[in-house]
């Protein structure tokens, strides 16, 4: 067992020794360039999704995550809250079931109010006037009504990364660039 340990130590020492001088080879392995440069590339590849978190790739995920929040906020302003909350939870995942699921509570709650609007003159219309009730039973206008609240919320998630990036960017170049400029000037002189 001791001979194997000694052999492993000698083998490790043999690989850690500098190479004999060859023409065109510096004689040692430059780990800072040959190993760390691919690591820097790999780290940059990993960091790019985080820097563009609020912008390109995760923007699609943010659309899907904001839809339930907005859809739950808009029905709270409606008169019938529980009917809207129950269908919106399964309708979050695909866009196709939103159209069949939305008219079902819309037909039960809004269609009788439209039929009774001539019978009940203003009190039935007043609570529904702030929200566009008449366009809601139409299916092409339903995707537009959730899209309008989503669009103002999309600029809000990118703002904190932008401010943090702006606060980091002025600090880093002020320290790094003058040092490189001075060394370049010294090399030129």
UniProtKB/Swiss-Prot annotation:
This is Amelogenin. Plays a role in the biomineralization of teeth. Seems to regulate the formation of crystallites during the secretory stage of tooth enamel development. Thought to play a major role in the structural organization and mineralization of developing enamel. SMART domains: Amelogenin. A number of other isoforms are produced by carboxy-terminal processing. Pfam families: Amelogenin. Residues 1-16 form the signal peptide. GO terms for cellular component: collagen-containing extracellular matrix; extracellular region; supramolecular complex. Residues 129-140, 152-161 have a biased composition (Pro residues). GO terms for molecular function: calcium ion binding; identical protein binding; structural constituent of tooth enamel. The modification Phosphoserine is found at residue 32. Disulfide bonds: none annotated. InterPro entries: Amelogenin (IPR004116).
